[in-house]
Swiss-Prot record:
Keyword Repeat in annotation: no
Record protein name field: Outer-membrane lipoprotein LolB
Subcellular localization, as worded in the UniProt entry: Cell outer membrane
Gene designation per UniProt: lolB
Keywords: Cell outer membrane, Chaperone, Lipoprotein, Membrane, Palmitate, Protein transport, Signal, Transport
């Protein structure tokens, strides 16, 4: 099936509130060594989570387009997750359901698409080259395949630098939600060239 010229809605008056809410403030204090036992324990605690979900604000900004949305991310098992994007008025713009070997996406017109790579599918359908395969780890505060990263003074990720498919991504964490155990990212910003992706997590539910 030919891929449509599908785009999420552009900037709406309500969307400016989302952008303000996503402002990043860098963690303070000296960083800790990536070889520290506290960091290894934190990574293990996060990896031990079987199920989790989070919701919040999403912004994608580039020279070509500006997209603002609410998001809901739910992980129900190994490589099984659901991503929902809604516009500031509450209407669904994109729903993605992924499991091993199968990805289904429904757009804002109700059209259903199937593929085996969620990252490639979202890039083609939305025009937003989101590094989804890596973001699945980064949103948890894990480095994924990245080896160039820094920790904050609480032995949590503060910054990641990662090269993927000729693109150099930088991820900056602006804080953590300590109401959950283990502590989970509260907001983060990804940059690559002239594009930025901002995420602000309102809350986490972990199991």
């Amino acid at each position: 099936m030919p891929l449509p010229d599908f785009r999420l809605i552009r900037l709406l008056p309500l969307a400016s509130l989302v952008l303000t809410a996503c402002t990043i403030t860098s963690p303070k204090g000296p960083g800790k060594s990536p070889d520290s036992p506290q960091w290894r324990q934190h990574q293990q605690d996060v990896r031990n989570l079987n199920q989790y979900q989070t919701r919040g604000a999403f912004a994608y900004i580039s020279d070509q387009q500006k997209v603002y949305a609410r998001f809901f991310w739910q992980q129900t098992g190994q490589d099984r997750y659901r991503l929902l994007l809604t516009n500031p008025l509450g209407s669904t713009e994109l729903e993605l359901n992924a499991q091993p070997g199968n990805v289904q996406l429904v757009d804002n017109k109700g059209q259903r698409y199937t593929a085996d790579d969620a990252e490639e599918m979202i890039g083609k359908l939305t025009g937003m080259p989101i590094p989804l395969n890596s973001l699945r780890q980064w949103i948890l505060g894990l480095p994924g395949d990245a080896t160039d990263y820094k920790l904050d003074d609480q032995y949590r990720l503060s910054e990641i630098t990662y090269s993927q498919n000729g693109k150099n991504w930088k991820v900056v964490y602006g804080g953590y939600d300590t109401k959950t155990q283990p502590a989970m990212p509260a907001n983060m910003e990804l940059t690559e060239g002239g594009q930025r992706i901002k995420l602000k997590m309102d809350n986490w539910i972990v199991k």
